[in-house]
From Swiss-Prot:
This is Thiol-disulfide oxidoreductase ResA. NCBIfam families: PRK03147.1. Disulfide bonds join 73-76. Belongs to the thioredoxin family. ResA subfamily. The keyword Cell membrane applies. It comes from Bacillus licheniformis (strain ATCC 14580 / DSM 13 / JCM 2505 / CCUG 7422 / NBRC 12200 / NCIMB 9375 / NCTC 10341 / NRRL NRS-1264 / Gibson 46).
Length: 177
């Protein structure tokens, strides 16, 4: 009887260890990114708070600073003034900001925009399809897209104003001053 119990416990322990090992292997060694640097950015079409449709492929020829954010996200709140300042500098140099709000209401986003003086396009990803297409986990996450529509860098986490300036400079079209 004791021997049978020993084998059952050992079997259960081995199954648990195998499951743990597979989970760790999957998390560490398998690349689950849907998009990566050097790939074409997934095309999407989303509406802003006023119902106007923004299509990513219509921005081809411009550098795109694609930022995923939420009104509840403290680092996002700190980044927005920096993004607004740099948008003033780069919007006439062929760089566009597209801020993708994730899963929030028009009212919440509209109030946030008013409170933070947002001067760049903000679109709503209410069903999180674009978030999932880009495989975004933490907020904020920013994709830098060159004028050819290729992802050149992915930035996870909060950025300083200097970083935002440098990244926008990196994606501006050649020949822009």
């Amino acid at each position: 009887m004791k021997k049978k119990r020993f084998y059952i416990r050992t079997g259960i322990l081995l199954v648990l260890l195998a499951a743990l090992g597979y989970t760790l292997y999957s998390a560490v060694f398998q690349n689950t990114e849907s998009v990566a640097v050097g790939e074409k950015a997934p095309i999407f079409s989303l509406e802003d708070v006023d119902g106007n449709r923004l299509k990513l492929d219509e921005l081809k020829g411009k550098g795109v600073f694609l930022n995923f954010w939420g009104t509840w996200c403290e680092p996002c709140k700190r980044e927005f003034p920096y993004m607004a300042n740099q948008y003033k500098v780069f919007k006439d140099k062929g760089v566009e900001i597209v801020a993708v709000n994730v899963g929030e209401s028009n009212l919440a986003v509209r109030n946030f925009m008013k409170d933070h003086g947002v001067n760049f396009p903000v679109v709503l990803d209410k069903d999180r399809q674009v978030l999932n297409a880009y495989d975004v986990t933490p907020l904020p996450t920013t994709f830098l897209i060159n004028p050819d529509g290729e992802i050149v860098k992915v930035v996870t986490g909060e950025m300083t104003e200097r970083m935002i300036h440098d990244y926008m400079n990196m994606i501006k079209p050649e020949g822009s001053s």
